[in-house]
Amino acid sequence: MNTSSSFAERLIRWQRQHGRHDLPWQIKNPYCVWLSEIMLQQTQVATVLDYYPRFLEKFPTVQTLAAAPQDEVLSLWAGLGYYSRARNLHKAAQQVVGQFGGTFPSERKDLETLCGVGRSTAAAICAFAFNRRETILDGNVKRVLCRVFARDGNPQDKKFENSLWTLAESLLPSENADMPAYTQGLMDLGATVCKRTKPLCHQCPMADICEAKKQNRIAELPRKKTAPEVQTLPLYWLIIRNQDGAILLEKRPAKGIWGGLYCVPCFETLNETYVYAEKLGIVSDDLSEQPALTHRLTHRLLLITPFQTPQRPSENLSDGLWVSPEHLADYGLPKPLSDYLNRPQPDLF
């Protein structure tokens, strides 16, 4: 049996019988496909299912997204993480409107010119929205290919990755009409059956042709990437309220943690925290240290110490915004800050 030729046939048949068919972005609309693909980068489907409909309701077309203020986009994105995706999403929408007349291009190379769209994302848009014979190669797909074809190599080696691209391209079905089912099948198989741990080999349509299974190498393929060391980063928050109880927020720099979101004044050293407070007329003795909280990012553990104060600085002492508690949800806040401010606050008076 020709494993390569039977791979696509098996996958398409399996997807149509057992794959996921109720995802809201499974429509021939390149805007919806693109939006979902960006959201799904490093984010679980279950999480995206919560954000996607709200985002689409607010921005039903690429034109409405392009015309929106970036702060509005970031506000809706808050909690999804990897905020550069939201900034790139906004820029890409403006590119589609400005450079392509508001119509998504159907060629992969053109799609790759959009901010935040790489080869695999562009291929997914081509396959789902335009039935183009373009292959995706995300983490789930790499795992499927490495196991079915017993491909062993350093996942961080560019030559090995290129060999997987070549393999993936050779497996594409011959009929353009099969591309949506084939592409969704790759995603579904990797996400629900050929899982990283505890794969469900008895449910896999490739079980009898899987080389890793024959060689008893399922657990070792694909090789694991060398995980970077998780670094602990201390942060200090200043929770400052004015006479009306509004909270001081500042916009974070575009680059770095929570880039572009609104946050309370946030610092990496205690000294910076004290210096900033003094500029607002708040002496360090009037800062009340609260119990620290932690928040895990991909390769960082944030150790956050909030400081509250009973002092009420003058509003003209800061370039930030004073936002009443009932309007905090209108701003894109980092999730740990949003969670913290929704807790019962200490009585300092």
Q: What does each model-identified segment do?
A:
Residues 3, 8-202, 206-215, 219, ...:
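Catalytic cores of DNA base-excision repair glycosylases
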Residues 1-21, 26, 191-349:
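Intrinsically disordered, low-complexity, charged terminal extensions of DNA damage-control enzymes
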